[in-house]
Regions:
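Acidic, surface-exposed loops and disordered segments
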Residues: 1-218
């Protein structure tokens, strides 16, 4: 049996082991991730560790994308110098709350994502790369779809490690590209403040559609 088959079997064993330990999240976990989770505008002074930020990425990278591509790129803004570079790029209404966050993640989409195809999809090392080069009009849709999908996983991973997220679009993205992604094919998607949210800054939750308004059984 070759090494690929061994890896396949190990992957199957891991799934079976996980299912033997847990079949669904309990209500406490659902509260943390969904029901009581909010987008925060204010932050406590607690620090966020490097290990927490690494764990966030290590969780989101496991989630599915098209053909296992990985367009997401992340700049974790923490230092005074980096925040000073970010501040004028933010829309004025968002500056104070963003600068107050212990960490601000700039989430970008790498339009050269397909150059890593041989590593991420070794079973078809040139498949996606050839497709993108032959059909360049597909690059932006693929990068934006999968990068945004990974950015959504990012928010859930932030919550999963016990932190809070404050995602927002309110910045000059072209200026952010020049400031933080110069010399690359990365385009800014949005930013997300990360830290321990101050509950006193939260407003009432806005309405959501009910199941029957957006879903249908066929």
């Amino acid at each position: 049996m070759d090494s690929k088959d061994d890896l396949d079997l190990k992957a199957q064993e891991l799934i079976n082991e996980a299912r033997s330990r847990v079949t669904e999240l309990d209500e406490t976990a659902k509260l943390l991730l969904f029901k009581a989770a909010r987008s925060f505008n204010g932050w406590k002074k607690n620090t966020v560790s490097d290990d927490q930020l690494r764990e966030i990425y290590d969780l989101l990278k496991l989630c599915p994308t098209s053909a296992n591509v990985c367009p997401i790129r992340i700049k974790f803004i923490r230092s005074k110098t980096a925040k000073e570079l970010l501040q004028p790029i933010l829309f004025e209404a968002n500056r104070a709350k963003t600068m107050d966050a212990p960490v601000v993640a700039i989430l970008g989409n790498d339009y050269a994502f397909f150059e890593h195809n041989s590593f991420l999809a070794p079973h078809k090392p040139q498949g996606i790369a050839d497709r993108m080069r032959e059909n360049p009009q597909l690059v932006a849709p693929w990068a934006n779809l999968n990068g945004t999908l990974q950015a959504a996983y990012f928010i859930m991973a932030v919550r999963a490690v016990g932190l809070d997220a404050g995602p927002m679009q309110g910045l000059d993205k072209e200026a952010a590209d020049r400031a933080f992604w110069e010399g690359t094919e990365v385009k800014t998607n949005f930013i997300c403040s990360v830290g321990y949210g101050d509950e006193t800054t939260v407003f009432k939750k806005l309405p959501r559609f009910e199941f029957d308004q957006v879903c249908e059984f066929l």
